[in-house]
Amino acid sequence: PDSYDAPDPRIKQLARRSTVTPGGAACRYNDIIPADHCLHDVQDMSTLNHPRADLSKGQYGCVGQGLHIAKKLLPYIPNNAGILLVPCCRGGSAFTQGAEGTFSESTGASQDSARWGVGKPLYQDLISRTKAALQKNPKNVLLAVCWMQGEFDMSAATHAQQPALFTAMLTQFRADLSVFNAQCHGGSAADVPWICGDTTYYWKNTYATQYDTVYGGYKNRESEGVYFVPFMTDGNGVNTATNAPAEDPDIPASGYYGAASRTNGNQVSSNRPTHFSSWARRSIIPDRLATAILNAAGRTSAFISGKAPEIKPSPGGNTPSGPSADTSVRTISLLPAAGEAAAQGWSIKDGGIQLSDGVFKITKQSNKTWS
């Protein structure tokens, strides 16, 4: 956290665990909290500490790519905007095998949830947390979904079902999110790109035919808003580093300790080449995912200008809003269902009322009551 994995105050995440960091400040499910290298995913990776980690410096758990994707996107968004990550990952999950687990509105999917599909606990977790993120603030916009899944479908006899099950879930996700179309990239949930990442060379070498079916199912679907991102090799054709000790060695002279010094008690899997290294998750993986997001969603005036989406409420309705850090000052925005506020006779009466861009705002001042 004090070097490669340093957080940024403009990058937040939706909470899942009971504390922001192990032993840290308390938080509740779906609170907005700082994002770091080990996000609040379905599977809690915060206890798999590297044997050389200094926990007093926050060097806990495993390194994921989420924070690093966001950090690479920051230079491309307006300075007054931030990024809210919605962690919903579950390692070893599949569409065609695995335990379904359970889902709760107050805690999300259980850690043993390992089955994707329409209506499954993992899907309920994904859609409910996405909606929660958008409800936090009407200016929040769903930019993209990063999707890295397929390994455990390849090892199933029913692997050929994965592409159709994925497509069905994608279709349902977009339908369920259509109520938030105004807060989605392009003005529609159907326009939000799904950025589908590749896997390690181990999986392709072991399951060549299955790889072509599962990961091939993500390819050539740009017209559907599905974008495949290759990770298997770098720009020179060299295999992207995994957790194999030779590919992520310790470099004591530099103070870097990789997967080589992890053991069965603190590593993701004893089958080392099945997972990308933490170094890859800081570099080539977020580089390519961020680039894919920018190519799919970044070349729009709304993205470049940071213009908030227009929310069209029904008469008498409220626009969604998130909790305010300062409860002594609250703002309610009322938008006319049709026409302009000024044309309807609204005017400024005192300093607590503002009329800006056709939006009439009344701000509650500290130690004052509504009247």
Question: What are the residue ranges of the model-derived segments?
Answer:
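Cell-envelope and extracellular/periplasmic
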Residues: 1-316
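Extracellular glycan-recognition regions
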Residues: 319-371
